[in-house]
Amino acid sequence: VNRFCSSGLQTIAMAANSIRSDGSDCIVAGGAESISIPGGGSPKESIDPELLKVAPDIFMAMIDTADIVAERYKVSREYQDEYSLESQRRMAAAQQANKFKDEIVPMKTKMKVVDKATKAESIVDYVVDRDECNRPETTMEGLAKLEPVKGAGKYVTAGNASQLSDG
C-alpha cells in the first residue's frame, strides 16, 4: 500500500474492514514511511507518468501544500510558530507525566551514530521507547530565526513543521 503518510492508517482501515466483512478473527496491520529514500519513499515506478500529465500536482510535497494552504487561508508564519511552540510545550509536559507510556511499545534496533568531529560512523544497539523528535527547549525567538524552507515569503520552517524521519 503506498499512501505516503497515511499508509499505516490505510492498512489498519483495510484490516478492520476485513474483520467486519470477511469474518477474520485477528489481523495485524501497520505501516511505515521513508523520507530518507529519494522521492520520499516513493519508487519511481509507482508514479504514473500519464497521471502526472493530467494532474501534475498530484504528488506535490507536503511543504508546498502547507505553504499554499497558509497563503490561501491567511495563516501567518507567526501564528504557525506560536502553535508550534505550544505543541512543543504540550508534548514535553505529556512526556514528563508519562502520558504515552502505555501507547508505545519499546523496540530494540540498531542505530548509526556519526561522530560530528571525525565523521566516523558506528552502529550501536538502541531501544526506541518514546517519540524523540520533539524539542522541549524551543522558544519563539528560536523559531523566528529559522528561514522558510522554500525561501522568503513562504511559511514552513524546520521549527513549525513535522520532522523529516523514517518510521
Language model segments and positions:
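N-terminal extracellular/periplasmic Venus flytrap/periplasmic-binding protein-like
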Residues: 82-167
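A glycine/threonine-rich phosphate-anchoring loop and its flanking beta-alpha core
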Residues: 41-78
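Residue-level recognition of conserved structural "scaffold" positions that shape functional pockets
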Residues: 15, 37-38, 105
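Generic structural motif
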Residues: 35, 66, 110-114
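Short acidic, glycine/serine/threonine-rich loops at helix termini
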Residues: 37-43, 118-119
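Conserved catalytic cysteine-centered active-site region
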Residues: 1-25, 45, 56-64, 136-163
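Active-site-proximal alpha-helical scaffold in enzymes
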Residues: 3-32, 70-99, 167
